[in-house]
Regions:
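Accessible peptide chain termini
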Residues: 1, 83, 359-360
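Extracellular/lumenal glycan-associated context and N-glycosylation machinery
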Residues: 1-57
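An amphipathic, basic-hydrophobic helix/alpha-beta surface used to engage anionic
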Residues: 38-282, 317-321, 335
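Short coil/turn segments at secondary-structure boundaries
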Residues: 9, 33, 182, 201-205, ...
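Intrinsic-disorder/low-complexity, polar/charged segments
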Residues: 2-5, 23-27, 156, 215, ...
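Acidic, glycine-rich A-domain
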Residues: 250, 257-396
Length: 396
């Protein structure tokens, strides 16, 4: 039996005792019963009255990342008297999980509700539930209040080392190396001069050539990076909270962070649910996180069709993120290779999400002739995996 049914039953039992005593004409019983029945009824009515007089507003956390615990601030905006055990809880849409409601005291005027951000996204909060006990502690009462608010949960990402040391480049010829796509490039080798700090001596080259050498490095010219995200829904494998598209978003955020940290700029390419392609360029990280938080896999365009709609910057390093590769990608990849800008094709491993036969071995062999290809799985150490992929692709 629910608490509400028990509370109503108690009121009706008291009411029936009062009526019965009145019918059989027992004045003293009528008086006692009416008095005892009026106490909880009065407590209930007063509690409801004061609860409906209370108005709260809510403040949602900013900069919250998927997998973190967040706090929603509930402030009492208006109130005459607070019933005991007053709490406020926002009606959170799934998959957000409320951990503990906010306890409110009129004197303090505010409380914190704890919740867990299970998945990235943009969540609109429309209601809060105010709960309390009556003044006698017999009944539990509650009501809903309309609110308007939006909360953004950013995607999670990893910070990996994007500065690359090409220790072997240019060593044999004792000359300069080719610029890398961001990071540090090998510049030159020269003999150590008297008066310089011994710390600058490269002992490996010294042992090889029999003389003291110094290796000079210079900051490589930063390159922009274009990240194309496949938003085709048929290419999403896994459940609502953990799937290949969510892995793509995490990889995109991580690559964007590394590129910006390395002095470049980032262009995000995707298609919306109407099949309209979008291309947005960024030089700071927070707007990228906000875009990725809002992105959904609802586009009718496959990745190959999206790429046909775009005129991409030839000077930008191109990264393609998908979990549904097919032969239709080969013409685009071949064209980019002929232009001297081989893309980086990152495949989200659908087999790690329970999908078998998601791509063929012959396709993988074909595509390797035109692009750097890497497969990223759910169980991979993403930081180490991206560091290795970045190093391989940057050295091409």
């Amino acid at each position: 039996m629910s608490p509400r049914v028990k509370q109503l039953s108690l009121l009706f039992i008291g009411f029936y005792i009062l009526i019965l005593a009145f019918i059989i004409k027992l004045p003293h019983i009528v008086f006692i019963a009416s008095f005892l029945w009026s106490l909880p009824l009065s407590s209930l009515l007063l509690s409801y009255f004061f609860l409906f007089k209370i108005k709260v507003n809510v403040e949602f956390p900013a900069g919250l990342t998927r997998g973190e615990e967040g706090k929603i601030i509930h402030r009492i905006e208006k109130g005459v008297f607070a019933p005991p055990m007053l709490t406020s809880r926002a009606v959170l849409p799934p998959p957000l999980v409320s951990i503990e409601p906010a306890s409110l005291i009129l004197a303090e005027g505010m409380g914190e509700e704890r919740f867990f951000a299970v998945k990235r996204g943009v969540y609109r909060i429309k209601e809060v539930i105010l709960s309390a006990c009556d003044f006698l502690g017999i009944f539990q009462i509650r009501r809903k209040q309309k609110v308007e608010g939006e909360m953004i949960v950013y995607p999670s990402y990893v910070k990996f080392t994007s500065h690359l040391l090409f220790s072997g480049r240019g060593e044999e010829g004792m000359g300069g190396g080719q610029p890398s796509r961001g990071g540090v490039e090998f510049a030159s080798v020269r003999e150590w001069e008297s008066g310089e700090s011994p710390r600058r001596i490269n002992w490996r080259l010294t042992a090889k050539w029999g003389r003291l050498f110094v290796v000079q490095h210079a900051q490589a010219g930063s390159r922009s990076q274009t990240i194309v995200i496949d938003c085709f829904p048929q290419g999403v494998f896994g459940d609502m909270k953990d799937n290949t598209f969510e892995l793509s978003i995490k990889v995109a955020a991580s690559l964007a962070w590394a590129t910006l940290e390395n002095g470049g700029d980032v262009t995000i390419v995707y298609a919306d649910e109407e099949g309209k392609p979008f291309l947005s360029r960024y030089t700071s990280f927070t707007p990228i996180l906000e875009l990725l938080a809002r992105l959904e896999a609802k586009s009718p365009l496959k990745l190959s069709s999206l790429l046909e709609e775009l005129n991409l910057d030839e000077e930008s390093s191109l990264v393609l993120l998908t979990s549904l590769p097919d032969e239709s990608l080969l013409p685009f990849l071949r064209k980019q290779r002929e232009m001297g800008n081989p893309p980086l094709l990152l495949l989200m491993d659908a087999s790690s999400f329970g999908r078998t036969g998601w791509f063929s071995a012959p396709f993988l062999e074909s595509v390797r002739a035109f692009a750097t290809v890497a497969v990223i799985g759910r169980e991979d150490n993403l930081k180490e995996r991206l560091e290795k992929i970045w190093a391989i692709h940057s050295s091409i």
